[in-house]
Regions:
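Cytoplasmic membrane-interface "Motif A"-like loop-to-helix N-cap segments
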Residues: 70-86, 306-321
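Multi-pass alpha-helical transporter architecture, strongest
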Residues: 8, 203-211, 331, 419-443
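Juxtamembrane intracellular "pre-TM" segments in multi-pass secondary transporters
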Residues: 1-8, 213-251
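C-terminal ends and interior cores of transmembrane alpha-helices
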Residues: 81-101, 320-345
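Hydrophobic core of transmembrane alpha-helices in multi-pass small-molecule transporters
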Residues: 90, 97, 102-121, 339-365
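Helix-to-loop junctions at the C-terminal end of transmembrane segments
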Residues: 61-75, 296-310, 336, 409
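Short amphipathic helix-loop junctions that connect adjacent transmembrane helices
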Residues: 23-46, 266-283
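Central cavity-lining transmembrane alpha-helices of secondary-active solute carriers
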Residues: 48-68, 157, 288-300
Length: 443
């Protein structure tokens, strides 16, 4: 491979390395495990929502400032190393969540430390995208990265289900006891998801750190000076955002639809475990289906993005995901879309698997095109700051989905009604796209 190709593949490997935090911890393995330990689906959904919402507020406050500092200092890699360490620490410590000594606040603390590490590392690697290829190839490269990341999540999930995660019988999907002598009665197979995610990230970030070289910035400032210079400029950037109508509208739109999508990811496994009574294995299969469709449609969406631009791709996927959010409310163990079913019926399971496939397809393509749309809206010399604002947009209201789900679930005592805020968030995001120019404001 040429140096340029290695750089692109190294960048892809960040998606491959980091995706298991979303796939295994946030959605399909560790989230449902917390539900099973707490024993009350509604209470677990509410606690999970409060924890994720708090982490989102921290990310929202710091992302733009750190992005501006990185642009001034030319030091994205330093931040990626730092937040990678938080990722690994947070994931590893989830091993200490045994059912016999389960401290929900300890678990949420380290889960959120890892989540913060992942989100900040993502901000800095996303900002490298425009340096990798010509503008015409942005959609394809972004889509390929998302697809490669989803494949990484699938492989990690398959390893988890086949070799480690014990089902209700105490055996894995292969019908064997968890490997390495892990004790299924203490849920050690399932708890090993934390160390697995930590080791996976550390191993597969090696190509990234070896092959992705940051261009030398001739006017780079020391970190201290960069911090002092970045804050006034960031305030100026925020003050003039309303005058940059297209960028402002896009940040606001993505703020809502990405929050809704993240709500689907975070609560999908918890919802299935609580409403349908699925085991960790069932939720894992659901995750494989969603990740497979996510990989395929991130790749297809990237091709479509390169041909017609990111805006039509974003609109299409937000519409699809809105319809899915509506459909989820009407799937339970007792009925499917209003039609009563017997207690042994497989229709609720089949229906939710189909919805999971649609969530994966829409989510993969939507996230890929959202990344390229941000590149089109941003000023090239302020790219990391722009992706910091993008992270701010994703997190400034990121507490709305989890906290509103937590509140509505608490008030109604129903996990089904608890997910209805996602519908409203998708529709707000769709409406705000009306003011977004496909290629951003003219220079």
């Amino acid at each position: 491979m040429t140096a340029a190709q290695k750089r692109i593949w190294g960048w892809y490997f960040f998606d491959w390395a980091s995706q298991p935090y979303n796939t295994l911890l946030l959605t399909f393995i560790f989230g449902p495990y917390v539900v099973s330990v707490i024993g009350d689906g509604s209470a677990a959904q509410a606690i999970w929502g409060y924890g994720i919402g708090t982490a989102g507020l921290i990310i929202a406050v710091l992302s733009p400032l750190l992005g501006a500092v990185a642009d001034k200092s030319g030091g994205r890699m330093v931040f990626i190393w730092l937040f990678s360490a938080l990722y690994v620490l947070g994931a590893w410590m989830l091993w200490y969540s045994a059912p016999s000594d389960f401290n929900v606040w300890f678990v949420m603390l380290f889960f959120c430390i890892g989540l913060i590490g992942m989100e900040f590392a993502t901000t800095f690697t996303n900002a490298m995208l425009p340096d990798l290829c010509p503008r015409a190839d942005l959609g394809r490269i972004s889509g390929n990265g998302w697809a490669f990341g989803y494949l990484g999540g699938i492989v990690a999930l398959i390893i988890m289900l086949l070799l480690l995660a014990e089902g209700t019988s105490g055996r894995t999907l292969l019908g064997i006891a968890p490997i390495f002598g892990l004790n299924p009665e203490a849920r050690e197979g399932t708890r090993s998801v934390g160390p697995l995610v930590a080791i996976w990230y550390a191993l597969f970030m090696i190509p990234f750190f070896l092959w992705v070289k940051e261009p030398r910035k001739t006017d780079a400032l020391p970190i201290g000076q960069a911090l002092r210079a970045a804050w006034p400029e960031l305030k100026l950037t925020l003050a003039r955002l309303p005058q940059q109508r297209s960028l402002f509208a896009y940040l606001a739109s993505s703020m809502f639809y990405r929050d809704a999508l993240n709500g689907m990811y975070v609560f999908g496994g918890i919802y299935a475990a609580g409403v349908l009574g699925w085991s960790v294995t069932n939720v894992g299969i659901f995750g494989i289906i969603a990740a497979l469709t996510g990989a395929v449609f991130a790749w297809l969406g990237g091709k479509m993005d390169s041909q017609v631009g990111p805006k039509p791709v974003i609109i299409l996927n937000v519409v699809v995901l809105t319809l899915v959010a509506i459909a989820v409310v009407f799937v339970s163990r007792d009925s499917v879309f209003g039609v009563p079913v017997g207690p042994d019926s497989i229709l609720p399971d089949v229906g939710f698997y189909i919805l999971g496939a649609l969530i994966g397809a829409g989510g993969g393509s939507l996230q890929s095109s959202s990344r390229t749309m941000m590149v089109r809206q941003a000023e090239p010399e302020r790219m990391t700051e722009a992706f910091g604002l993008y992270a701010l947009a994703g997190k400034a209201t990121s507490f709305i989905a989890p906290l509103s789900i937590g509140v509505v679930t608490d008030l109604t005592g129903s996990q089904q009604l608890g997910v209805t805020p996602l519908i409203v968030l998708f529709l707000i995001g769709l409406f705000l796209l009306l003011w977004v120019k496909p290629d951003g404001e003219p220079a």
